[in-house]
Amino acid sequence: MAASGKTSKSEPNHVIFKKISRDKSVTIYLGNRDYIDHVSQVQPVDGVVLVDPDLVKGKKVYVTLTCAFRYGQEDIDVIGLTFRRDLYFSRVQVYPPVGAASTPTKLQESLLKKLGSNTYPFLLTFPDYLPCSVMLQPAPQDSGKSCGVDFEVKAFATDSTDAEEDKIPKKSSVRLLIRKVQHAPLEMGPQPRAEAAWQFFMSDKPLHLAVSLNKEIYFHGEPIPVTVTVTNNTEKTVKKIKAFVEQVANVVLYSSDYYVKPVAMEEAQEKVPPNSTLTKTLTLLPLLANNRERRGIALDGKIKHEDTNLASSTIIKEGIDRTVLGILVSYQIKVKLTVSGFLGELTSSEVATEVPFRLMHPQPEDPAKESYQDANLVFEEFARHNLKDAGEAEEGKRDKNDVDE
C-alpha cells in the first residue's frame, strides 16, 4: 500500500525514472539519467526491468546500451554517407535470467523489494574510450536531430534469436535517453598564464601583454577573474581592452568542422597611454543562459524537457583515438587590445593572446554515501505523446504519491 504524501525529513526522496512499453509487457526503471565520468572510472547504468510473464508469453527480454554520433543533417545520406554512426552497443538478457546472478546494487535491492518477483536487475558499463554526451545547439528555426553524441538505454521483449533492431516489436520495447557527464579530475594543472609582445612601426620599444588566471579548472556557473597587465612602452595609446571566453568545438568524426564561439565578454573602461602600465582584473561568467539563441554552441547533451549547460571540456585519455570522441570541446580566455594608429580609427590595429583553461562539473562530495534503502522512492513516469519519429517524444510526469511502504 502506498504511503501518504508526508515524508520524514530524515528519509529523503529519490526519483526513479520509469517507462512502460506500449503493450505493457516490460517496464524499465532507472535511478539516474545522468551518469558521471570520474575520469578514472565511469558510473555504471544499474536498473531493473519489470516483466509481465503473461504478456511476454515465452519471449526473451533484453536491455541494450547504445552510444551514437549524429551528424545532424539527415539529407547527408544523399552523398553516400549515413547521418548516424553507432560508437558502442552492448546487450544483456535479463529474462529469463542467464548465468550466475550478480550482487544487486543498493538501488536494485530497493526496487526488487518494492516491485516483486517479476523484477530483474541489469548492469551496463561504459568502456573507457567512449565520449561524454555533447550536442551542437541548433538555431531556433532548425528542425530535425542535432549534431552530437547521445546515449540510449532500451528494454524490449522479442522471440527473435538475434534480436536485430528491425525484428523488435515496437509495442514491446521502451527506451530512455541518458547522459554521460564529465566531472573534473581531482588534481588541477598549473596556473594558466600567457605573455606576448608586439613591435610597432616607428616605435623603439614593444607593447607587452600578460594574462593570468588563478587556477586551471573552473566549474559551470563560477565567475572567472582574468588578470590583465598591459605595459605600453610605445608611442601609441591602447584604446580598448576586451576579454572573451571562447568555446572551441572541433567535430572530428565525418568532417573537420571547427567552431570558435565567444560565450562571455567584458571590456575595461580604462585606456593605456604611451609609456604607462595598467593592471586590471576582468570577471567573465560563461553561461548557456546568455547564449540560448546561438547556433553551434556545444552543450553537455540535452534530454527533452530538461535544462542543460555549456559543454564541459573534453578529456582525451591516454591511448584513446580522438576521432571516436565525436566532438572535442575546449575553452580559452582571449584578451584583445586595440591600439591607435597615425590616422586614428582608420589605421588602428588589434593584437591578442589566448590562455587555455577547463570548464567542468565538480566531483560529488561523497558518492559512496548515496543509499536508497531509507529513501522514499518517487516514480517519474515518461509517457509517449504525439510520436512524430523514431525518437519518441518524452514528457516527464511525477507521480503524486510516494511509494514508500
Swiss-Prot record:
Family: Belongs to the arrestin family.
Domain of life of the native organism: Eukaryota
Listed GO biological process terms: cell surface receptor signaling pathway; G protein-coupled opsin signaling pathway; G protein-coupled receptor internalization
Record's subcellular location: Cell projection, Cilium, Photoreceptor outer segment; Membrane
UniProt domain comment: The C-terminus interferes with binding to non-phosphorylated RHO. Interaction with phosphorylated RHO triggers displacement of the C-terminus and leads to a conformation change that mediates high-affinity RHO binding.
Phosphothreonine: modified positions: 234
Stated name of the protein: S-arrestin
Membrane keyword on record: yes
